[in-house]
Amino acid sequence: MXXXRKSHPLIKIINHSFIDLPTPSNISSWWNFGSLLGVCLGIQIITGLFLAMHYTADTSTAFSSVTHICRDVNYGWLIRYTHANGASMFFIFLYFHIGRGIYYGSYTFMETWNIGVLLLFTVMATAFMGYVLPWGQMSFWGATVITNLLSAIPYIGPTLVEWIWGGFSVDKATLTRFFAFHFILPFIITAMVMIHLLFLHETGSNNPSGINSDSDKIPFHPYYTIKDILGLMMMILILSMLILFSPDLLGDPDNYTPANPLSTPPHIKPEWYFLFAYAILRSIPNKLGGVMALVLSILILALFPVLHMSKQRSMTFRPASQCLLWILVANLIILTWIGGQPVEYPFITIGQLASISYFSIILILMPMTSLVENKLLKW
């Protein structure tokens, strides 16, 4: 019976992925976020499924169906707020996970990293379409503004936008297709996650030192299963506090007003986790330039393996690069703040400066610092 774990075709795969997986003995809590993201994805799919049972993807009833879920469905409010705040947790963990990858040089696993970048784009697309579904003011105007950006694409832009809308404005057809895509994409994400793990297990995990750890591996279970459970408990605690004490903390009050194409909200802004990219988009006065900067702000992650100039993999023993990375983090926080502010004098300038520094830190300062560090170490 004990042999079934290693011989059964299906259980064998699970065994090699989560039980007998050789893992570096020194990986820190920064390596917990992968499993937490998996749990978040599971929570989102389950709560989303239950929401879909009561939601109607029609402009005339979408808003009231969400109200019905919160008021009349047993624990509907809990399912709805778990789904909404679960998305926020998902993005917090995603950004931590990416930050960990940058700090410890995990991007040298090219295949794993590139699938990860694709995953980020897919998750962002899914979250954006999910935000449109409650059909509140910010849902409608957010969808209008963001889809309209595609009209900046030369020649095919305007046609492409109308094709996505399914008409001449964001309307019933748009809502229906967004619901369809929002439902299917998490399953595509799950498949991509499996590929992500497949590539990761080809090379094995990275570790804080950035050097090969083949000589010092321990089994994943029980050492890291118990460590992941601790992270899971902390996540559940934070998420529960968010849902039960201040479920609307991260939301926008405008989304409690039903969508009205005739009145524009004073400040159109996306959910908090897109604000940094939104600030970069707004900081460029030209439409096409803004869209390109928006896409590049995420796509730039794919350049990290190319921009890696250091002879060391990890930043553990590189104080100057560490300093730059933390400046980049501060810069992203500033961009997030600016993205939520109105387009007025001080904010415009701050946003432009933060956008310039975002790209220059990644493209110029970090590679140059790495080269200087190599010189200092006589490499």
Swiss-Prot record:
Pfam families recorded: Cytochrom_B_C, Cytochrome_B
GO cellular component: mitochondrial inner membrane; respiratory chain complex III
Cofactor: heme b
Identification of the protein by name: Cytochrome b
Location (main, coarse): mitochondrion
Membrane topology per record: Multi-pass membrane protein
A GO biological-process term: mitochondrial electron transport, ubiquinol to cytochrome c
Protein source organism: Capromys pilorides
Other observations noted: Heme 1 (or BL or b562) is low-potential and absorbs at about 562 nm, and heme 2 (or BH or b566) is high-potential and absorbs at about 566 nm.
Main function: Component of the ubiquinol-cytochrome c reductase complex (complex III or cytochrome b-c1 complex) that is part of the mitochondrial respiratory chain. The b-c1 complex mediates electron transfer from ubiquinol to cytochrome c. Contributes to the generation of a proton gradient across the mitochondrial membrane that is then used for ATP synthesis.
UniProt subunit comment: The cytochrome bc1 complex contains 11 subunits: 3 respiratory subunits (MT-CYB, CYC1 and UQCRFS1), 2 core proteins (UQCRC1 and UQCRC2) and 6 low-molecular weight proteins (UQCRH/QCR6, UQCRB/QCR7, UQCRQ/QCR8, UQCR10/QCR9, UQCR11/QCR10 and a cleavage product of UQCRFS1). This cytochrome bc1 complex then forms a dimer.
Alphabetical UniProt keywords: Electron transport, Heme, Iron, Membrane, Metal-binding, Mitochondrion, Mitochondrion inner membrane, Respiratory chain, Transmembrane, Transmembrane helix, Transport, Ubiquinone
One Gene Ontology MF term: ubiquinol-cytochrome-c reductase activity
Binding site for a ubiquinone: 201
Cofactor comment: Binds 2 heme b groups non-covalently.
Origin: domain of life: Eukaryota
Chain positions recorded as heme b b562 binding sites: 83, 182
Xref: PROSITE patterns: CYTB_CTER (PS51003), CYTB_NTER (PS51002)
TM spans (from-to): 33-53, 77-98, 113-133, 178-198, 226-246, 288-308, 320-340, 347-367
Residues holding heme b b566: 97, 196
CDD domains to which the protein is assigned, alphabetical: cytochrome_b_C, Cytochrome_b_N
Cellular compartments annotated: Mitochondrion inner membrane
Protein family per UniProt: Belongs to the cytochrome b family.
PANTHER family: CYTOCHROME B
